[in-house]
């Protein structure tokens, strides 16, 4: 028999679970201020719950959108100017919703990075 292959861990691939957990602990103080009475659960879960019970909707239909900043992040990195990236991200998603006639109720996020420095 040959030697046993070593299992690859998250840490081996550059993922620092501890740093990620520390980052998630800091988010509620910022994000919770955006919640309204319809948000059922908070940050850190893998899915979110939003109640339509308090909405006055005659024909309820949920519309979701998820968009990224695309190549604009490359320009931000090259110029070291990140000031508009977050605003642009939110604006692009809201624009995708309102052009359908939908009312923005919540924001879906996706955070991706090569290394988390907190």
Enumerate the predicted regions with their spans.
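N-terminal amphipathic/basic leader segments beginning at the initiator methionine
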Residues: 2-38
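Glycine-rich phosphate/pyrophosphate-binding loop regions near the starts of catalytic domains
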Residues: 29, 35-118
């Amino acid at each position: 028999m040959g030697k046993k292959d070593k299992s690859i861990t998250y840490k081996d691939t550059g993922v620092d679970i501890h740093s990620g957990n520390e980052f998630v602990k800091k988010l509620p103080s910022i994000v919770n201020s955006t919640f309204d009475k319809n948000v059922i659960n908070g940050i850190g879960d893998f899915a979110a719950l939003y109640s339509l019970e308090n909405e006055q909707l005659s024909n309820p239909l949920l519309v979701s959108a998820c968009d990224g900043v695309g190549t604009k992040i490359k320009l931000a990195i090259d110029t070291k100017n990140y000031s508009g990236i977050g605003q642009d991200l939110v604006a692009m998603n809201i624009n995708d919703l309102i052009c359908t006639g939908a009312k923005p109720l919540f924001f879906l996020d996706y955070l991706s990075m090569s290394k988390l420095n907190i």
